[in-house]
Amino acid sequence: MLVLQLAVLVTAVYAFVHAALQRPDAYTAAEKLTKPVWLVILGAAVSLTSILGFVFGVLGIVIAACAAGVYLVDVRPKLLDIQGKSR
């Protein structure tokens, strides 16, 4: 359980940092939610797995994994395509 929580935490932190480093206009150009909304979603995912992980348990880990997964699989590739960066 702890290994799963740590893996989701690392993934959520990576997604949060990646989202923070992107240009705000790239989100709207990719027709995705705005940058502040994604930062709130991914920040909540990080807090669900780190600070609140013991309160919410497996449910918090699953929610955080879904949020980070959606960003990394759907939003990140579109942002990189819009900005002309390679994956």
From Swiss-Prot:
Residues 1-19 form the signal peptide. It is a single-pass membrane protein. It is found in: Membrane. InterPro entries: DUF2516. One of its GO terms (cellular component) is membrane. It comes from the Bacteria. Keywords: Membrane, Signal, Transmembrane, Transmembrane helix. The chain crosses the membrane at residues 51-71. Its main location: membrane. To M.tuberculosis Rv0476. This is Uncharacterized protein ML2453.
